[in-house]
């Protein structure tokens, strides 16, 4: 693995290897490679709290040097292309680029670069490190993916998390279902759409998605009713009470309390939302460690 662009390019062996590596970092049973002479640049063209901060901590724990880059003060504001920006960073010595961009599959225009790229989210396309940290969180609970019933609820069409998790969970043997308003369904994903109330008592993992108003048409935003959405697709206390004893709740965050999930359930006993955030730092350590070790081995 010399880049991480999409979950569809990861095989199951690579997924398990990354989970095991991240778990070893988390448990103090592994030491990262020696990367004090390596440089990383984080290019975030969309707002981010968890992902950006998580990558920053992961990079610092690995000993990488950070190239200061802020999109608001970069030459992108003067019209420089994404390719030229990344090529510049490659030429001045960056060893890996972490990129979040509003353009889906932005990385297609970077294929001629000779530098590893980690996709931190591309429009409504993919979010591979979020999927990996979700998989790590699930694996900590069940030690398997085979046969698990996963319900992904919400704005499926506009969610890169839904697409990445659908691909990876299906490949690992889980049964994925969606629950979504008609206008937010993604028919390209070959999983059944179900009524949340008809399946809630047999679900192992409830994965809630943020309503992504920033990707909606104006008419969708103005017609959106919080109470109606929460009643039809949100995790309410009554639905929580029907969950299996070992079922867990997940959400990629940021969480809109009272919309996707009842406020009091965000830190309920079955919730793993904040554990996901913790695991994110370790999975990103594992991804960067693996990519740079692969790059080093290739260079020898």
Swiss-Prot record:
Record keyword Repeat present: no
One family name in Pfam for this protein: OTCace_N
Record-annotated membrane-spanning stretches: none
One BP term from GO: amino acid metabolic process
Pathway note: Pyrimidine metabolism; UMP biosynthesis via de novo pathway; (S)-dihydroorotate from bicarbonate: step 2/3
Sequence positions that bind carbamoyl phosphate: 50-51, 100, 127, 130, 253-254
GO cellular component, as recorded: cytosol
Catalytic activity field: carbamoyl phosphate + L-aspartate = N-carbamoyl-L-aspartate + phosphate + H(+)
Binding site for L-aspartate: 78, 160, 210
Assigned keywords, A-Z: Pyrimidine biosynthesis, Transferase
GO MF term (any one): aspartate carbamoyltransferase activity
E.C. numbers: 2.1.3.2
InterPro entries documented for this protein: Asp/Orn_carbamoyltranf_P-bd (IPR006132), Asp/Orn_carbamoylTrfase (IPR006130), Asp/Orn_carbamoylTrfase_sf (IPR036901), Asp_carbamoyltransf (IPR002082), Asp_carbamoyltransf_Asp/Orn-bd (IPR006131)
Keyword DNA damage: no
NCBIfam families named in the record: asp_carb_tr (TIGR00670), PRK00856.1 (NF002032)
Protein family membership: Belongs to the aspartate/ornithine carbamoyltransferase superfamily. ATCase family.
Subunit and interaction comment: Heterododecamer (2C3:3R2) of six catalytic PyrB chains organized as two trimers (C3), and six regulatory PyrI chains organized as three dimers (R2).
Stated role: Catalyzes the condensation of carbamoyl phosphate and aspartate to form carbamoyl aspartate and inorganic phosphate, the committed step in the de novo pyrimidine nucleotide biosynthesis pathway.
UniProt protein name: Aspartate carbamoyltransferase catalytic subunit
Organism: Staphylococcus saprophyticus subsp. saprophyticus (strain ATCC 15305 / DSM 20229 / NCIMB 8711 / NCTC 7292 / S-41)
């Amino acid at each position: 693995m010399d880049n991480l662009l999409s979950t569809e390019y990861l095989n199951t062996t690579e997924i398990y290897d990354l989970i095991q590596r991240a778990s070893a970092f988390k448990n103090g049973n592994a030491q990262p490679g020696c990367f004090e002479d390596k440089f990383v640049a984080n290019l975030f063209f969309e707002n981010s709290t968890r992902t950006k901060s998580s990558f920053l901590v992961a990079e610092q724990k690995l000993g990488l040097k950070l190239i200061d880059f802020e999109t608001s003060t970069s030459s992108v504001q003067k019209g420089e292309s994404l390719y030229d920006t990344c090529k510049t960073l490659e030429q001045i010595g960056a060893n890996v680029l972490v990129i979040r961009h509003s353009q889906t599959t932005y990385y297609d225009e970077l294929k001629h670069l000779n530098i590893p790229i980690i996709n931190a989210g591309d429009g409504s396309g993919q979010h591979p490190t979020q999927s990996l940290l979700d998989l790590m969180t699930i694996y900590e609970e069940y030690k398997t993916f085979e046969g698990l019933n996963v319900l992904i609820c919400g704005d499926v069409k506009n969610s890169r998390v839904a697409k990445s998790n659908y691909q990876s969970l299906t490949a690992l043997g889980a049964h994925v279902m969606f629950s979504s308003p008609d206008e937010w369904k993604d028919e390209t994903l070959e999983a059944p759409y179900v009524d949340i109330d008809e399946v809630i008592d047999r679900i192992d993992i409830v994965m809630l998605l943020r309503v992504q108003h920033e990707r909606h048409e104006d008419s969708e935003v103005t017609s959106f009713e919080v109470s109606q959405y929460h009643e039809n697709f949100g995790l309410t206390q009554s639905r929580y009470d029907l969950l299996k004893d070992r079922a867990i709740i997940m959400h990629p965050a940021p969480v809109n309390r009272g919309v996707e999930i009842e406020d009091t359930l965000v830190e309920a006993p079955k919730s793993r939302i904040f554990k996901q955030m913790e695991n994110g730092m370790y999975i990103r350590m594992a991804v960067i460690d693996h990519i740079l070790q692969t790059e080093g081995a290739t260079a020898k």
